[in-house]
C-alpha cells in the first residue's frame, strides 16, 4: 500500500495526521491530485509510479491501461514498480537479458543511520544526532537543516524520524524486516 511511500516527504512534515483514515497534513505540501510532486527526491529514485518517464515510455498503471514500457497489460497490484538498482539499459532491444551487479553489503548511508540511531538511544545531543543524518538529505538536494526543525526535540521524535529515514534511504536493500523486528 501507500504507507512506506508516505515517508518520502520534502517539507519534513508528515503527509498524514492520523493513522486509521489518513487525514492529509496541510503543512506537508501533499496534493492528492498530484501525489508525487514536492516529495523527497529519493521517491523518484526508488520506485516507478504512474506518469513517470522511464526508458522508452511512460509508466501507466491505471486500470485497463498499458503499464510498462514494453506495452504489456500486466499491471502491478500496488501501482508501483521497483526502480532502485534497475538500470534503464535493460530496455534496449539489443540487451541480452543479463545485468550483473556487485551486491552492496553496507553503504555509508547505513553507517550514518546506525550511528544516529545509536547516538539517539544513548542520549546523545540533539545536534549530534541530526547532524549525523544531514549528509543523506544534503546529497539529494534537501538542504534545509534538520537542527532548525522544531518537531525533533525529544528522543522519541528523533527515533521516529530516524526510522522513517531508514525506510526511505534503505528501501529495497533488505533492511526493513530486520529493522521492524529490532524495533519491536
Language-model segments: which ranges?
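Acidic/polar-rich alpha-helix caps and helix-coil junctions
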Residues: 1-184
